[in-house]
């Protein structure tokens, strides 16, 4: 849970490091099946901490080293979510802007409250949302992404769902229960199979059509050989619940 509402849950250096560490640790815990990223307050995540960025300009190099390190840390966090062996769900209640919108786009799934809003407003500040663009452009259509990036306009939950930035939106009162229902449904599946599937999904989307089919054919062949596939198929034939 992002727990810095006084600073609008901005991705400070400390927040970036903490989130990265939590994702890393959760990846290796067998007891954890699904990761949910939620937030306290009425802002899910406002992006980078602009006060920290402004303060860094007082460094001898005008902040050059700090800025490179900051954006590298943020990029590593987003990649750790994609590379995490567990599905990651964003539970968005409130506003998600800039790197906060990037965080939502980087998660495997995202459910928001109906009142939530999203934006990549860096262009309005003279600082284009270049790293958020990576996650955004890989999750929504190019023209929808470019419109958000070039205008900096805020979009509502309905539009966010239309462009596939989020999976769905519900009332604030039902948000947590809806997310938990989704998380529990996934948690009932074979963790080994989910891990194989998530990794294969992100790997194949970067490949050509023929290479993607060659790669996924190998993945499925190997998957078919493991114990969970054997148990799953047997339980289906026997009309019983599988035991993973």
Question: Residue ranges of each PLM-predicted region?
Answer:
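Terminal peptide-recognition signature
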Residues: 4, 18-19, 37, 49, ...
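Glycine- (often His-adjacent) and acidic-residue-rich active-site loop
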Residues: 24, 39-80, 96, 208
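Crotonase-fold acyl-CoA enzyme core
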Residues: 79-192, 225-226, 231-234, 240
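Helix-loop "lid/cap" segments that line or gate small-molecule binding pockets
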Residues: 148-149, 200, 218-224
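Charged catalytic carboxylate motif
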Residues: 14-18, 73, 80, 178, ...
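Hydrophobic alpha-helical segments typical of transmembrane helices
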Residues: 66, 73, 77, 132-135, ...
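Conserved CoA-thioester-binding segment of acyl-CoA-metabolizing enzymes
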Residues: 1-40, 76-79
